[in-house]
From Swiss-Prot:
Catalytic residues (positions): H117 (pros-phosphohistidine intermediate)
Names of required cofactors: Mg(2+)
Name recorded for this polypeptide: Nucleoside diphosphate kinase
SUPFAM superfamilies reported in the protein's UniProt record: Nucleoside diphosphate kinase, NDK (SSF54919)
Function: Major role in the synthesis of nucleoside triphosphates other than ATP. The ATP gamma phosphate is transferred to the NDP beta phosphate via a ping-pong mechanism, using a phosphorylated active-site intermediate.
Enzyme class: transferase
GO molecular function: ATP binding; metal ion binding; nucleoside diphosphate kinase activity
Family: Belongs to the NDK family.
Subunit and partners: Homotetramer.
UniProt KW keywords: ATP-binding, Cytoplasm, Kinase, Magnesium, Metal-binding, Nucleotide metabolism, Nucleotide-binding, Phosphoprotein, Transferase
Gene3D superfamilies attached to this UniProt entry: Nucleoside diphosphate kinase-like domain (3.30.70.141)
One GO-annotated biological process of the protein: CTP biosynthetic process
CDD domains registered for this protein in UniProt: NDPk_I
Length: 143
């Protein structure tokens, strides 16, 4: 199996409800290592840049507004098949459709406030990691 890196955001709704520790526990319990992490308050420009691929979609304005409504936790996760592993931990985008025991089933209120973001591919993970972290902020864990 391939050791990969993926990018994750704990969104403003989950941060406001103090779910950071519980979500980190889920990552680590699934064998993912947190190799970079920080809390940030996204500016409108940062949110628009990060979600630029959705700029033509009708929900874009609401997404940017939500993502700038409070601080978020951004983190880099590393582990075997990390992209897929994190997506399985997160569950379906719509929490009403998310499998029981997934982050979105347990911590999300709606499809709009769905607690977490995770990269959908190794390539997007690399781009998203670089958007928030410099190379010297990522600390591989070899033990």
């Amino acid at each position: 199996m391939a050791i990969e890196r993926t990018f994750s955001i704990i969104k403003p709704d989950a941060v406001a409800k103090n779910h950071i520790g519980a979500i980190y526990n889920r990552f680590e319990s699934a064998g993912l290592k947190i190799i970079a992490s920080k809390m940030v308050q996204l500016s409108k420009e940062q949110a628009e840049g990060f979600y630029a691929e959705h700029s033509a979609r009708p929900f874009f304005g609401a997404l940017v507004s939500f993502m700038t409504s409070g601080p978020v936790m951004v983190q880099v996760l590393e582990g075997e098949n990390a992209v897929l592993a994190n997506r399985e931990i997160m569950g379906a985008t719509n929490p009403a459709e998310a499998a029981r025991g997934t982050l979105r089933a347990d911590y999300a209120a709606s499809i709009d406030e769905n607690a977490v973001h995770g990269s959908d591919a190794v390539e997007s993970a690399a781009r998203e990691i670089a958007y928030f972290f410099s190379a010297d902020e990522v600390c591989p864990r070899t033990r």
